Amino acid sequence: MIDTTLPLTDIHRHLDGNIRPQTILELGRRYNISLPAQSLETLIPHVQVIANEPDLVSFLTKLDWGVKVLASLDACRRVAFENIEDAARNGLHYVELRFSPGYMAMAHQLPVAGVVEAVIDGVREGCRTFGVQAKLIGIMSRTFGEAACQQELEAFLAHRDQITALDLAGDELGFPGSLFLSHFNRARDADWHITVHAGEAAGPESIWQAIRELGAERIGHGVKAIEDRALMDFLAEQQIGIESCLTSNIQTSTVAELAAHPLKMFLEHGIRASINTDDPGVQGVDIIHEYTVAAPAAGLSREQIRQAQINGLEMAFLSAEEKRALREKVAAK
């Protein structure tokens, strides 16, 4: 179901949601951190989704063990490097990795700006080693409040040339986008792109707010857009992309089953929607699974899957020249 003549992208992929279970085990041992299990087999149920979680917040707790072992900036650098290695193994040509440095720094009180620098270093080295093209999206974790998000924003601004876009993620219901207007004003002043997690836990009004008040060019998840026909029309007309994450939306109980996922209807409506993973390390999936298993189960035809793959590059935070070069590189292989 993957068209090998086209670039394969993953533009909604959390770096801090893709820490390998084996790495969690190794870092836990290195830094003498108590883990809930001492073997890979027994650790996996604690760090990966085995059965669907009742809601988004429950799902997010699965990520916590991964960041609890980030006891040094070297550990942050390692997981960033491994994220690129994993992308290469999956056959990705281009990946946008998003991360929350405040969340990664929290367990061991690491310097937030230092985490940003370590991630940049790890990703740069990974791209050199594995030949994958990558860009970084900075996440503000809304769950920790406005002041914590301000700290994350300052850390990103200290490395503004290495950050491509700003995102807002976490508890969408408890911390609406209206709390973060000034943060996104500064992001736009920095000439960053804007993507926002919206319409996952909250309704279509959250998507409208992300677009109108925060300046979102893309929406992460956006499943609740299906409830508002005017919004669907607007997304299609303005070419505001939806970063769909099929398996993730089932595991968080945002959508009951793949057959009920709105991605097919988004594509039929002319919305620029793409297929992505979200937190592959926690979910126990990869981009190949999303294309070959999840997308057909969600009712997508072969042509719709191909369109979603095309959309992934069209939606990417790349210049027209970068997109053209990537298409030519893949076509020449």
UniProtKB/Swiss-Prot annotation:
Gene3D superfamilies: Metal-dependent hydrolases (3.20.20.140). Its EC number is 3.5.4.4. Pfam families: A_deaminase. Its cofactor is Zn(2+). One of its GO terms (molecular function) is 2'-deoxyadenosine deaminase activity. InterPro entries: A/AMP_deam_AS, A_deaminase, A_deaminase_dom, Ado/ade_deaminase, Metal_Hydrolase. The keyword Nucleus does not apply. One of its GO terms (cellular component) is cytosol. The active site is at E200. Substrate binds at H14, D16, G170, D279. It is an enzyme of class 3 (hydrolase). It catalyses: adenosine + H2O + H(+) = inosine + NH4(+); 2'-deoxyadenosine + H2O + H(+) = 2'-deoxyinosine + NH4(+). Keywords: Hydrolase, Metal-binding, Nucleotide metabolism, Zinc. Belongs to the metallo-dependent hydrolases superfamily. Adenosine and AMP deaminases family. Adenosine deaminase subfamily. NCBIfam families: aden_deam, PRK09358.1-1. This is Adenosine deaminase. The gene is add.
